[in-house]
């Protein structure tokens, strides 16, 4: 990470908290340890993923395939990040709520805490800011008139 620049959205993609498709409780999508080995090149966002629900035991794996040009890719397009779903299975994110007439969502608690810290700041970073996940936040989230409402919604999600 560059000094003074928050992580990119892709940096949070090692863990998604989603609604389990079977029981609707909190399930995790993560990169299994064996997918991080040196024999299988790991490209951030294009590694094998596992869906696991500890409440009901539901599991499902998804693996990228090596293409003709030696790049790793999934057989499907990754989901649009604006939809409030994970990129791999298309499941609704667990950490989401309505706020100020918009959907507020986070991939995981690290993502939530980083955005919370950004929203709390009165003076926001400049410089290489455009590389960060914070720079991609919708305008309404950055407006001071919504700061209190956004922070209340985040507090509610932290207890989720």
Describe every region a protein language model picked out:
Residues 6-9, 39-42, 98-101, 123, ...:
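Residues at structural and domain junctions
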Residues 134-160:
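C-terminal, charged low-complexity interaction regions
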Residues 1-74:
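N-terminal cysteine/histidine-rich coordination modules
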Residues 66-133:
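Extended interfacial segments that mediate partner engagement and assembly in macromolecular machines
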Residues 46, 55, 69, 81, ...:
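Acidic, Ser/Pro/Thr-rich low-complexity regulatory regions
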Residues 11-14, 44, 106, 128, ...:
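Residue-level detector of secondary-structure boundary/capping sites
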Residues 58, 120-121, 159:
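Short, intrinsically disordered, mixed-charge
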């Amino acid at each position: 990470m560059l000094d003074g620049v928050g992580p990119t959205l892709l940096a949070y993609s090692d863990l998604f908290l989603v609604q389990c498709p079977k029981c609707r409780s909190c399930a995790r999508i993560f990169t299994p340890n064996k997918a991080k080995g040196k024999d299988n090149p790991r490209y951030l966002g294009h590694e094998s993923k596992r869906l696991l629900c500890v409440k009901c035991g539901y599991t499902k794996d998804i693996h990228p395939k090596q293409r003709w040009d030696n790049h790793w890719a999934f057989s499907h397009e990754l989901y649009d990040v604006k939809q409030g779903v994970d990129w791999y299975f298309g499941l609704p994110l667990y950490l989401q709520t309505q706020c100020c007439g918009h959907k507020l969502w986070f991939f995981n608690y690290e993502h939530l805490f980083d955005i919370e810290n950004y929203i709390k700041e009165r003076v926001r970073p400049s410089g290489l800011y455009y590389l960060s996940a914070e720079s991609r936040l919708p305008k309404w989230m950055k407006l001071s008139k919504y700061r209190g409402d956004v922070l209340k919604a985040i507090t509610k999600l932290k207890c989720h």
